[in-house]
Amino acid sequence: DGAFALEVMEYINKKVDEYKEKDGYLYAIYGTPAENLCGLQVKQFRKKFGIVANVSDKPYISNSFHCHVSEDISPIQKQDLEKRFWDLFNGGKIQYVKYPIDYNTAAVETLINRAMDMGFYEGVNLSLSYCDDCGHQELNMDVCPKCGSRNLTKIDRMNGYLSYSRVKGDTRLNQAKMEEIKDRVSM
């Protein structure tokens, strides 16, 4: 439900305010992307705390204050759930929402306008996979259902930018990030 994460962020903000008052420096909290850190961080956590359900039981850790990528929730639910964290990251943040590529443009526009009304800087995630052998396109595929090829190019959002998660079947991304991409439902 995010209650503990909210409690932690409120505590961190309180400490930041205390330090600002104490030394006069301007500190900020950034809702950070960590594409390469997601695998390393879970290993470090497990070394100290072991495997904890819903925290370190996957080969990656999700970024920042976002709902877990595997949550089966609508874009509106995701906006509503993440809103409570928004003002706690005063140094920068982005909210990611996954829209199926076949969404109608009026629906996408409505959701973006809703996000803007809520004060979000929202990244719209539109994934695409295509077969380099026959040209077939789908939202997400590991093997082309038309010709059986694994020679695919896949485009996914990578923490603020669109990136090739596969080019001609190969990837430059670490295994933890590829596992996170595979689990994506709401992000």
Predicted regions and their residues:
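Long, C-terminal-biased catalytic regions of enzyme "large/alpha" subunits
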Residues: D1-M187
